[in-house]
């Protein structure tokens, strides 16, 4: 299977987890997903009062500089870890 196909499968499988991952795990997945699909963050940091938006922005910004391929590989690894931990 190609890297893109593995990534797409991992993204699909993560949505089927039996238990919701904790916020830190979700933020890491979000950041890796956005880096994989879009690349380096290209939007301004949300307002201070937009806590959810700010958390998402920070998670994506942490992945800045990671190539799309490396981000996909990291996402796949994290997805496998969560699937083992929570089951699907």
Curated annotation (Swiss-Prot):
Residues in ACB domain copies: 3-88
Entry keywords, A to Z: Lipid-binding
Top-level lineage group: Eukaryota
Ligand binding (an acyl-CoA): 15, 30-34, 56, 75
InterPro entries: Acyl-CoA-binding_protein (IPR000582), Acyl-CoA-binding_sf (IPR035984), FERM/acyl-CoA-bd_prot_sf (IPR014352)
GO terms assigned for molecular function: fatty-acyl-CoA binding
Coiled-coil region(s): none
GO biological process: fatty acid metabolic process
Similarity comment: family membership: Belongs to the ACBD7 family.
Function description: Binds medium- and long-chain acyl-CoA esters.
Name under which the protein is recorded: Acyl-CoA-binding domain-containing protein 7
Source organism: Bos taurus
């Amino acid at each position: 299977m190609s890297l893109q196909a593995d990534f797409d499968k991992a993204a699909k499988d993560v949505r089927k987890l039996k238990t919701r991952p904790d916020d830190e795990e979700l933020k890491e997945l979000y950041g890796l997903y956005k880096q994989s699909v879009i690349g380096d963050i290209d939007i301004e940091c949300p307002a201070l009062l937009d806590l959810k938006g700010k958390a998402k922005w920070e998670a994506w910004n942490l992945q800045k500089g990671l190539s799309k391929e490396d981000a996909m590989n990291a996402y796949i690894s994290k997805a496998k870890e969560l699937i083992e931990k929570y089951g699907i």
